[in-house]
């Protein structure tokens, strides 16, 4: 299978050869969800992955705290996208921007690194890639790690917002009977089928197709 955007994914062997490249900046995006399935009004507690980062990370990597620094914490929902000015400043302050090639990775799942990839895309920054397999694959291959914390100097970030990256519920609702739109549920099948009440109201958006994406990604599909 050929990827439409092959530059969006890099392999561990490639990154190993870039560790001394000053134009490559690496970020651990790990976030941990502690599910509280008996409390549907609060389906999970969020924990930063910083403690895991301190134990082991790719040499030179800095850490990004998704909930604290890259979300709208005035929202009642976790991980709500902040306004573009705030987000651009957060990226810039953490060293993300010109002229650097940014590598995002996470532990125990790709969804955290892909979230940062999408947010950077939303602001128009294109020099970004995701480490295929994350740090789990890096460690499986026996590649070097370290435990000291790292940070990068701020970078120049000129945002050019792409409003087609994220949409609101009104847009989704209006697209439900639009033959040119496809809705895909990337959550596990038990949530799609309404067999798991984790998020309070079981089930899915009508007319939705599930791709079992979580299983496919975990299995390399």
Task: Describe the predicted segments one by one.
Residues 26-28, 63, 103-104, 129-132, ...:
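A structural signal for short, well-ordered beta-strand segments and their strand-loop junctions
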Residues 220-221:
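Hydrophobic alpha-helical segments, chiefly the membrane-spanning helices
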Residues 15, 61, 120, 208:
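Terminal peptide-recognition signature
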Residues 57-59, 124, 204:
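Short, structured coil segments at secondary-structure junctions
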Residues 209-214:
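Conserved small/polar residues in nucleotide/adenosyl-binding loops
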Residues 35-93:
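Aromatic- and Gly/Pro-rich amphipathic surface segment
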Residues 1-50, 135-203:
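Flexible, polar/low-complexity N-terminal or interdomain linker segments that lie immediately upstream
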Residues 4, 74-175, 196:
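Thiolate-centered catalytic microenvironments shared by cysteine-dependent enzyme domains
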